[in-house]
Structures are given as structure tokens and as C-alpha cells.
Amino acid sequence: MKIADARAVITGGASGLGLAVARHLTTAGGRVTLLDVQEGPGQAAAASLGGNAAFAKCDVTSEEEVNAAMEAARAGMGSINFLVNCAGVIGAGRVLGKNGPMAGDFFTRVVHINLIGTFLCDKAAAAIMQHNTSGPDGERGVIVHTSSVAAYEGQIGQAAYAATKAGVAGMTLPIARELAMFGIRVCSIAPGIFGTPMLSAMPPEIQDSLGKQVPFPARLGRPEEFAAVVQTIFEVAYLNGECIRLDGAIRMQPK
């Protein structure tokens, strides 16, 4: 499939990697529906992208909201053949912190957003994609997960985050194998240190220090580079069931 033919749902589309993907796709002629729990920023993001973008408010931890948002996206775009899961939270916290052990509710919240939210979006999108007219190789749709290098080298304070991102990477292959019968591919991207709004708010010297930890190129990853890999996954039909590290060869230290 070509990116101009994308009818994409992008979770976490109001900012960061999700917005970068949306901008990349619409610039190439694709259509997108942004899903985000932040209504104001989500509507503003969609408006900034022009007529090929729409917004639907959605909490990815709610199965009812996810199903409704997917149906609204299908109705608005005519079909869905691409899902890019970017919604997530960092969820930094120590198991034994200064104020005592981590609250179970904190860990559960991170799991619900990062892992269960991704799964709920996967199954809702796949239920729609399975009815698409098949293209070359019988393809009907593509799903992309956002994992993280923390899935492989989680740092101190990342127990919840690393667990969820490892779960996202871990379910990629079994879901890809299951959905193969419907002509739906599934891949994950595990980004390293990227220049997202959270990092951009840090002092320049901190950003430079983080960038210098990357072997090559010695800088923060650019959201546009993440978006370019998303396009590659969509267009290269033989990419399936894989988790791609996008990290400049960095291997995270314990802290």
C-alpha cells in the first residue's frame, strides 16, 4: 500500500510522536483521525493539519470509547486501513520510593494506558479492517505499536513503564500471526531518546547531554524520523511481526 492511500487512526495524536505521524501522513496525501484524551489540543492539532484530518476524543482505557471512536473514524474516512498507537504515559516511579512503596494503583494505571489501551485499539481497528477489500498480497490493514528501548533496558524508576512497553513488544508477534488470516500486518517501533514535548521542555544543556549519550548520530531522535519508519512499515508488505529499535544504537544505563 502507498502512504497516500492511508486511512489512519492515530492514538495520542494531539502531540509528540502521534502528531508528527499525522503531519507526515497528511502531507503525503493520506487521511487521519486523531484520537486523544485532550480535547482542546486534539481539535487544534486536527485543524492545523487541514481537511484530511479529524479528531475524536477518546480515553484508550475505555473499551466503549475506543469502539465509538473507531466507528466514527471509519464513518468519517470511509474505511480504516492503518492504526498507529502512540497514546501512552511515562509512569516513572520507584518500587521503594522516598515516601514508601509504589502504590498499586499507580502501576495499574500505567498498564491500563500503555498496554491494555494498545490492545483495545488493536482489536477495535482489526474488527473494521477485516472487512476491507484486499489489495496486493491480500493486504487489508496495518497496525503499528509504540514500544520503547525501556522494554529491553529499563532504567531505575521505570518498572511500570518498562513492563508495559515490553508487553507491547511481546504481543506484536502473536497478534501478527493471528491477524495474518485477515491480511492485517502488525509491527512495533521501539524508540530511544526522542525530542518530544516532554524533553523539549528541559533546559538545552540537559537535552544536549542526553543526545551525547547516543553513539550515532549523537543527538536526540526527531519525531519526523519516527514518522518515516511508520511510513516504511505501511508500504513494505514483508515487514510483519517485528519490533524495530529506532535508537541510534544506544543501550540505556541503569540510571
What are the language-model segments listed below?
Residues 180, 185, 239-242:
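Short, small/polar-rich loop/turn modules that mediate ligand/substrate recognition or access, typified
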Residues 2, 222-246, 251:
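C-terminal substrate-recognition "lid" of short-chain dehydrogenase/reductases
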Residues 122, 164:
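Active-site helix of classical SDR
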Residues 148:
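Residue(s) in the substrate-gating loop at a strand-loop-helix junction
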Residues 127, 176-178:
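Alpha-helical segment proximal to the catalytic Tyr-Lys
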Residues 67, 90-108, 131-137, 157-160, ...:
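Conserved mid-core segment of classical short-chain dehydrogenase/reductases
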Residues 89, 100-120, 144, 168:
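Catalytic Tyr-X3-Lys loop
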Residues 2-33:
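Canonical Rossmann dinucleotide-binding motif of NAD(H)/NADP(H)-dependent dehydrogenases/reductases
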